[in-house]
């Protein structure tokens, strides 16, 4: 379980301190698929980077399973059980997919397990296990290989920052299928995704909306999603709310 207490992050400009995240409180329970959304510039990616240890908070505390990780950097947080997937996955010329999976796992990984991780993200294992992680791979392929490394690592909290960025529609559809499988098979850990995409929001157990550096809405998907979308469900939610107020 991840707990954020009064977490803040600010940067100094020429005149004053600009607050990007302000006294934010958030708990992510174990075995939950949580999506963070909100307007551009609201602080979503900054929050993800603070949780991963890429950015250090200017105030507040971060706890993982009760242990204070506030001062830990990205390497120390990875060792504690937090993984972070970048918007644009890194390419490694000269390194094969199997080598990358073995490095990510942090242990001796056999070929059968490596092929299983690739299969779980919708890749034909025999076609990819010996491929180099280089420019010959598409953005969608790289995203799925990166997710396979997260599975191999077996972390307590897996963070994906706008995983849909830079991939085509076909790759996005495959990505959705991967996340749906991850949601169905989630155990001994949680998934946190930063996204605007309705199809990713629809997979969530919980949705957190961040605007102006603070949480504006938070709750189960079925409670929050209708407020975010101009759909029939939103109209129905509005009607029920109005009728309740009039009763």
Question: Where in this protein do the model-derived segments appear?
Answer:
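Conserved structural motif at the start of ABC-family nucleotide-binding domains
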Residues: 2, 19-23
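The feature captures the beta-strand-to-loop junction immediately N-terminal to the Walker
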Residues: 37-39
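Helix-to-loop junction immediately C-terminal to a conserved catalytic motif
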Residues: 52
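Conserved ABC transporter NBD signature motif
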Residues: 60-68, 113
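ABC ATPase NBD coupling module
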Residues: 68-83
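Q-loop/switch helix immediately C-terminal to the Walker
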Residues: 88, 94-110
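Walker B catalytic motif
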Residues: 159-163, 170
């Amino acid at each position: 379980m991840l707990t954020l207490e009064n977490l803040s992050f600010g940067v100094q400009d020429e005149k004053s301190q600009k607050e990007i995240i302000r006294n934010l409180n958030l708990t992510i329970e174990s075995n939950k698929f949580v999506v963070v959304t909100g307007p551009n510039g609201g602080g979503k990616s900054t929050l993800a980077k603070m949780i991963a240890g890429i950015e250090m908070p200017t105030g507040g505390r971060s706890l993982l399973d009760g242990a204070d990780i506030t001062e830990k950097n990205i390497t120390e947080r990875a060792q504690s059980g937090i993984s972070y997937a970048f918007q644009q996955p890194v390419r490694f010329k000269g390194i094969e997919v199997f080598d990358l999976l073995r490095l990510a796992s942090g242990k001796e990984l056999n070929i059968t397990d490596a092929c299983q991780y690739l299969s779980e993200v919708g890749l034909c294992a025999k076609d990819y296990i010996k491929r180099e992680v280089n420019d010959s791979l598409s953005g969608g392929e790289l995203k799925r290989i990166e997710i396979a490394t997260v599975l191999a690592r077996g972390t307590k909290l897996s963070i994906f920052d706008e995983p849909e960025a830079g991939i085509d529609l076909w790759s996005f559809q495959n990505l959705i299928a991967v996340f749906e499988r991850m949601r169905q098979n989630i155990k001994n850990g949680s998934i946190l995704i930063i996204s605007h995409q309705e199809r990713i929001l629809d997979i969530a157990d919980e949705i957190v909306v961040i605007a102006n550096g603070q949480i504006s809405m938070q709750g189960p998907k079925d409670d929050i999603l209708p407020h975010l979308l101009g759909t029939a469900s939103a109209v129905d939610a509005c009607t029920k709310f109005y009728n309740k107020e009039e009763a």
